[in-house]
Design a protein with these regions (language model features):
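A structural motif detector for beta-strand N-caps
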Residues: 249-253, 258, 263-271, 276, ...
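Conserved catalytic-core motifs of eukaryotic protein kinase domains, centered on the activation segment
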Residues: 22-25
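Catalytic-core segments of class I nucleotidyltransferases/pyrophosphorylases
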Residues: 106-108, 115, 121-128, 141-144, ...
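Acidic/His-rich active-site region of diverse nucleotide-sugar glycosyltransferases
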Residues: 89-91, 149-165
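A short, conserved acidic/glycine-rich loop-to-beta-strand motif
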Residues: 130-140
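Conserved N-terminal catalytic core of the sugar/cofactor nucleotidyltransferase
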Residues: 1-11, 19, 33-111, 115, ...
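A structural signal for short hydrophobic beta-strand segments in well-ordered beta-sheet cores
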Residues: 31, 151-154, 205, 216
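Short internal beta-strands
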Residues: 56-60, 137-138, 311
């Protein structure tokens, strides 16, 4: 079923993604893969299912990579974009897209790091019925986690009466949070000045509160913010366990615990434990063990190594055991032999990480000495 009311949407895509470093050194946050597919692909497919074909993004960090991927996409989306010279805030970015929307229309705004299969159609219906200027998708979470999010307090009719920005557990008046899924009327632009850094939570919503014009709809389906490394890892596990469902991936409730894209070379002797994904074009050596890890495209893993609880970005070359590591794109991790004052360090598990900045990081785990 597709809606017939909302025909346009915006995806906020300008963020640098510093909490996902080093993955975002070479890849913008919207292109971070979930089960080997960029999160923005998933969002665009979700919008297409709703009947929304016209989408605009505000870009800033690594903008050309986003534009290159979607300007001539095969997703059935008419992709539009603006390039920001400086960051404008969440609301300021929307303001720069104002000419894309028609006066009087209702539209959707999503965050590029929000992974969800929310019933947005339910949100649209709630928005229209409410007469609000803005409707926010809210999610109930465990009370002990509220300090990481913007908390919303609603009245008996679902209208917001108070916001709390990352309150302490003791001070939180609710355990419902703002998911960054918005449905707006065109009138929202009246509350955002031109050429000003402006934020929804800090600047726009307080003004709408005075007019009692912010409605909510509850998201009972899956939603997560993949803006941190920990949550990025968890979202992949959630796919395996069937907690979130997206049409593009076959790994839901996978008994094998692994998802491998076509075109990767995986020997039969490879051992998988836990849940792992492997991108396309990867070359895995003999007797490799992969445990609870996310491996992007075109990665090389040498023989006789173990990769555990790690993320390896595209085109990296791994020749040493790694555990609890996050490796950015185009990096080399290898075992090396070291000499010191005429002594050879034996049984030394050293890792040399040679990254694009040409720095070398040495990790000494254990070693003994023998004369040269």
């Amino acid at each position: 079923m597709t809606n017939k009311i909302v025909t346009k949407a915006m995806i906020m895509s300008a963020g640098v993604g510093s909490r996902l470093e080093p993955l975002t050194y070479a890849v913008p946050k919207p292109l971070i893969p979930i089960a080997n597919k960029p999160v923005m692909d998933i969002l665009l497919e979700k919008l297409r299912e709703l009947g929304i074909k016209n989408v605009i993004c505000n870009t800033y960090y690594l903008a050309e990579k986003i534009i290159e991927r979607y300007q001539y996409n095969q997703l059935g989306i008419h992709f539009n974009y603006i390039k920001e010279d400086t960051l404008s805030g969440t609301a300021g970015g929307l303001k720069k897209c104002q000419n894309f929307f028609d006066k009087g229309e209702t539209f959707i705004v999503l965050s590029a790091d929000g992974l969800t299969n929310a019933d947005i159609e339910k949100g649209i219906a709630s928005h229209i019925k409410s007469g609000a200027i803005a409707t926010i998708g809210i999610k109930q979470i465990p009370h002990e986690e509220v300090s990481h999010f913007g908390v919303v307090v609603t009245d008996e009719n679902g209208f917001i009466k108070e916001f709390q920005e990352k309150p302490t557990v003791e001070d939180a008046k609710s355990n419902y949070i703002n998911t960054g899924i918005y449905i707006f009327n065109y009138e929202i632009f009246d509350f955002i000045p031109e050429n000003t850094f402006y934020d929804f939570a800090k600047n726009v919503f307080p003004e709408l509160l005075k007019k009692r014009k912010i409605n909510t709809f509850e998201i009972n389906e899956y939603w997560t913010d993949i803006g941190t490394l920990a949550q990025y890892k968890q979202s992949t596990k959630d796919l395996f366990f069937g907690l979130c469902r997206f049409k593009h991936t076959p790994i839901i409730n996978s008994a094998s615990g692994k998802y491998i894209n076509n075109g990767s070379e995986i020997p039969a002797c490879t051992v998988f434990e836990g849940t792992s994904t492997i991108g396309s074009g990867c070359k895995i050596g003999k007797n490799v063990k992969i445990i609870d890890s996310i491996i992007w495209d075109d990665v090389i893993l040498e023989d006789n190594i173990t990769v555990k609880n790690s993320i390896i970005a595209s085109k990296s070359h791994i020749a040493s055991d790694i555990c609890d590591e996050v490796i950015g794109s185009n990096e080399i991790i290898q075992k090396i032999k070291a000499w010191f004052l005429g002594y050879f360090l034996l049984d030394l598990e050293e890792t040399a990480q040679v990254c694009k900045s040409y720095l070398v990081k040495i990790k000494l785990y254990r070693g003994t000495m023998a004369q040269r």
